[in-house]
Amino acid sequence: HVHDANTMGRKNPTYLVMDARVKGIRRLTVVYYNFVDPKVVYELYEAAHIMGISVRLGIKFKACFHDRYVEFLWTPKGFTDTKSVLDFLKEPETGALMQEGRSVEDWAKEEVLQTLEVFNAKHAAEIAKEWGIEVPLLSAKEFEEYVGMGQTTLIRLSEFVHSKLLPLVETEADKVKQELLSASPEDQGVLQERLNKLDELTSVVLYQRWLRPSRNPEIPSLSESADDNRPDLLKVDVQGLLSRLMHIRPSSRITLLTGKLSDADVLELLWLGQGRISHLEILNMKERELGRVKHLNEINQLQQAINRHNAIELKRIIQEMHQRLEIAQNPERSALFNEFLENIPRILSFYANQPLGSRFGSDSTTILGTRFGMGFAVPDTLPRSAQKMIEKESDESFQIPLHV
């Protein structure tokens, strides 16, 4: 799936579809967060129709799971044309959900603006001291203009801050380069270190060191669930969210995003879902690049045991999970996994008629550093020249250890 300029991407829906067409992509899921504007949907579907691309609408929601959030991608299905999608968005229950989603985005925006205030009050001085540049007071109004119609996020805040600091860094770097020309051998080493230090001030560093939620614990986080003043949609549990989504559109695909989850988490969520989770996003390229995909093999083995209706293998997997310290030493979770062992036939029954599907996401955004672009390709379907390029040893090459 990919993102357009209304969320985390760079391109508006029309240019996104045109780009997909040029790259040979014929099926595309465009993802939005918590809600989607009907005007955006109209542009997306009309552009896809003109370019001959099959497009699907995906909306990402969060649900409370223990002391954190898990994410689901809701993909309503069964639309015949643009009008049918727009009619669906006008239905009372869908409209109510979209309105609640807007409230979530408004709340999240305020948290980001609070982070900007903290940056001005505290972090700017730290950067000025460490990098030797005069950090200006950053304007919330300028930041909102920078974001435009896109989503107000900490990632975009990182890029905005970087855009304001970059001219200062470049000016300082030019001064250092001039000093290097006439510096003594002893001073050259110090000046080169100074130059290298200036190169380190990237949007990624700004996010990791000063802007991510863990660096500003006084501000409510979208990463951790809490019973505070956040909108009700951010307080709903897994069962409540899935029930609501399936009630609104029974012919829906609900994909569990597994990037930050263990196989034990996935099993527990499948149990809570009672068959309403139709797919697992086994691999997300953005999450992989960030080093968050740590249990891919184990999750895939769990999925295969369920889809093959292999009760013996599923029992072995659950027993192994049960022996882990984080489960064995937690009375509540230990009891839950005992319940799983007693209900293996029921777990298998969730996917007796329709297997638990797999999804692979490029999650293309082009934001905060280098990421893979949109889409995947099967090597055997490519021209021989392209296959030879793939076969060459490269740091970019890797195999996906999946069975589907």
PLM regions and their residue ranges:
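Non-catalytic, alpha-helical, charged scaffold/linker segments
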Residues: 84-196
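Charged catalytic cores and adjacent phosphate/nucleic-acid-binding surfaces used
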Residues: 2-27, 35-97, 103, 166-185, ...
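Phosphate-binding glycine-rich loops of NTP-binding sites
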Residues: 30
